[in-house]
């Protein structure tokens, strides 16, 4: 799910522009199930999806496999370059934008996700999840690269495993849960270039390994139908080793240069939600985080929502939050390009919006929304290209990002088994 702006504070800190939450839930199937989907796209892009499920009163299992691949090679007119046309006296008489080919954008991604859930039938559910990723991607050169059209390889490979064990308990008026997990990531970045006669020389040979152990506990407690209180606490212990195996010493021999670092991260929050009527609600969140040995100031957030009209289900929402984001270990120590001198980001985010939904059952549904957001961020971290041929993160002193977003969805039933769906989005986001 996509958490816009302030709403990310409910889940985690650091989401100055929002956050993306990845989660799954039991399939709730009886017996065996099989699903297969194939997608075909431009530039010989293929997507394969296979899912096998089994479920009964107590057990739910799901096995999913996804494979995506594409050479992603296409021609385009490069408007970031201009080629000069000369006369016999080497005077510029014309200029044009060249037609170039994207030759380094292929990818092959494999995802395997295994889930097993057991429901005791007495309010407790236990889960075991494993997710494996194998990714092999080429990285295109910059569109402003004026180097000669020689052979090169600019490739990033990744293997990641995420394992989670979970417990959830649901009772009248309250619920709680706990999770524990382990994440392992191996990442390789190789940049080679033809130095002549077909000999490919390594310019960069980066290897990174990340091990993370984490735990999380959360709870919810209801008082009647008007009050909801929540609490959440999570801890992550990261261990990262990043090295470049292609550093040349002054004596001409290769050396391995890199970093080996560890960091603890804690995050805790409490919230209160009050709904005095079915047409109005307000909630407040307070979060605080520890990164290494540094605490953030208190991170507050306030949310308001109200039903303007039940006819058309017209709802207005508004929120405000303060937030902080520490540079990740990848920002600080990734080789090549990491910047150990980065400062943490901080900022305020405001947003407001209105939405509606109308329709007739079995005939059509129409919904839409309009949102405004305004964000002020200090020391924004952004990865930028360098003259050394790779990207590196740096702090931009002050950033003001604002804009509007419009969205509309229409679904029309053409027949009992057929429907036509249309959606549109518009955004205006200067900064």
PLM region descriptions:
Residues 136, 186-188, 292-298, 306-351, ...:
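Surface-exposed extracellular loop regions of Gram-negative outer-membrane beta-barrel proteins
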Residues 42-69, 81-136, 159-173, 221-229, ...:
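Transmembrane beta-barrel wall of Gram-negative outer-membrane proteins
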Residues 275-281, 367, 371-376, 395-431:
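Gram-negative outer-membrane beta-barrel transporters
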Residues 155-160, 182, 190, 194-283:
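Outer-membrane beta-barrel transmembrane domain signature of Gram-negative proteins
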Residues 74, 103-109, 122-176, 184-211:
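Flexible loop and strand-edge segments within Gram-negative outer membrane beta-barrel domains
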Residues 58-61, 123-126, 173-176, 226-229, ...:
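Repeated loop/turn-to-beta-strand initiation elements of outer-membrane beta-barrel proteins
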Residues 1-3, 10, 14-39, 48-50:
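N-terminal periplasmic accessory domains that precede
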Residues 35-37, 47, 97-102, 145-155, ...:
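Extracellular loop and loop/strand-boundary signature of outer-membrane beta-barrel proteins
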């Amino acid at each position: 799910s996509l958490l816009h702006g302030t709403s990310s504070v409910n889940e985690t800190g650091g989401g100055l522009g929002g956050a993306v939450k990845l989660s799954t839930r039991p399939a709730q199937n009886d017996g065996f199930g099989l699903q297969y989907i194939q997608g075909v796209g431009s530039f010989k892009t293929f997507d394969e999806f296979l899912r096998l499920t089994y479920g009964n009163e107590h057990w739910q299992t799901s096995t999913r496999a996804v494979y995506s691949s594409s050479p992603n090679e296409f021609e385009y007119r490069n408007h970031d370059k201009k080629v000069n046309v000369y006369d016999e006296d080497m005077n510029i008489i014309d200029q044009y934008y060249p037609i170039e080919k994207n030759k380094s954008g292929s990818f092959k991604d494999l995802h395997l996700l295994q889930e097993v859930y057991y429901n005791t039938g007495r309010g407790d559910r236990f889960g075991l999840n494993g997710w494996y990723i194998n990714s092999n991607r080429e990285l295109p050169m910059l569109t402003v690269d004026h180097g000669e059209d020689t052979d090169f390889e600019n490739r990033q490979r990744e293997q990641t495993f995420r394992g989670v064990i979970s417990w959830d308990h649901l009772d009248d008026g309250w619920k709680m849960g706990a999770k524990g997990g382990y994440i392992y990531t191996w990442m390789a970045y190789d940049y080679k270039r033809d130095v002549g006669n077909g000999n490919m020389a390594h310019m960069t040979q980066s290897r990174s390994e990340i091990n993370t152990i984490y735990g999380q506990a959360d709870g919810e407690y209801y008082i009647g139908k008007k009050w909801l209180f929540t609490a959440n606490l999570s801890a992550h212990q990261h261990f990262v080793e990043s090295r470049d195996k292609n550093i040349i010493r002054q004596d001409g021999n290769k050396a391995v240069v890199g970093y080996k670092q560890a960091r603890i991260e804690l995050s805790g929050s409490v919230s209160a939600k009050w709904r005095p009527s079915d047409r109005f609600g307000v909630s407040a969140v307070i979060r605080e985080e520890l990164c290494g040995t540094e605490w953030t100031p208190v991170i507050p957030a306030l949310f308001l929502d109200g039903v303007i009209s039940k006819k058309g289900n017209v709802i207005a929402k508004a929120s405000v939050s303060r937030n902080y984001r520490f540079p990740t270990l990848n920002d600080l120590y990734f080789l090549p390009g990491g910047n150990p001198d980065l400062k943490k980001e901080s900022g305020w985010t405001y947003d407001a919006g209105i939405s509606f939904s109308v329709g007739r059952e079995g005939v059509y549904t129409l919904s839409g929304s309009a949102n405004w957001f305004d964000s002020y961020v200090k020391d924004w971290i952004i990865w930028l290209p360098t003259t050394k041929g790779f990207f590196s993160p740096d702090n931009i002193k002050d950033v003001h990002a604002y804009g509007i977003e419009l969205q509309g969805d229409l679904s029309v039933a053409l027949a009992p088994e057929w429907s036509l769906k249309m959606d549109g989005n518009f955004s205006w986001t200067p900064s």
